[in-house]
Amino acid sequence: MAAIEYSGRDNLDVMAHAKNYNRFLLDLVLQNAHPDQSIVDFGAGNGTFAGPIAKSHDRIVCIETDPTLCAALQSQGLTVVNDLAELSDGSIDYLYSLNVLEHIEDDEAIAALWFKKVRPGGQILVFVPAFQFLFTSMDQHVGHHRRYTRTSLTRVIQKAQFQITDSYYADSVGVLATLLYKALDQGGGQVNVRMLRIYDRWCFPISRFIDHITRRFIGKNAIVRAVKPA
């Protein structure tokens, strides 16, 4: 598997304060998750999503390479595998990846590996940061190679031979917030917890409402759902 050199553990801890954002992502994942499916959290981090999902979906496997994060996942009783290549071909019903693909230099190789491991008819969900003009020191701090557009993300997934079932943007207000962060950025790449909480509590719900109008052309994140042809 292509190496993932992750340097953003502190960012994961900070993002735990974004309750509405995390609830949104969890709901996003659960839309396609069924209790009897084999599910893979690709880049499970500290278990923010795999932990709650495992309470009702016992066939979930966490893919994680960072030793510290692996230990955190195992302490929650989660099944952890370091390399997706270790799983049998065509064994996965549903794979989701949240804010991970941007960390991988050869994203096309990873998408091809997903295709190999997902069963025919199986589904994937990919959630990534959007728009290169929003690239900040925070992206650099946590090891992002790029940000995506709907088009560029779709291209990577289609090249792996998946069929796209939906693609859209999320968090329209987050575009303005990120531009403000970029304008005030002093290069540290850190997240202000107080400002994050304020945004998550008051702005993110508004953003979700506006997203119904803007989802096809603007948003801080890009989302793709796809299926492996049967």
Language model segments and positions:
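Conserved N-terminal segment of class I S-adenosyl-L-methionine
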Residues: 1-98, 108-113, 192, 197, ...
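A C-terminal cap/extension of S-adenosyl-L-methionine-dependent methyltransferases
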Residues: 5-7, 171-230
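Short, glycine-/aromatic-enriched active-site segment of Class I SAM-dependent methyltransferases
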Residues: 12, 124-146, 150-156
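Helix-to-beta-strand junctions that scaffold the AdoMet/dcAdoMet cofactor pocket
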Residues: 34, 104-105, 118-120
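Residues lining the SAM
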Residues: 98-101, 127
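A short glycine-rich, Lys/Arg-flanked "PGG" loop and its adjoining helix->strand segment in the class I
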Residues: 109-123
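Conserved S-adenosyl-L-methionine
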Residues: 162-172
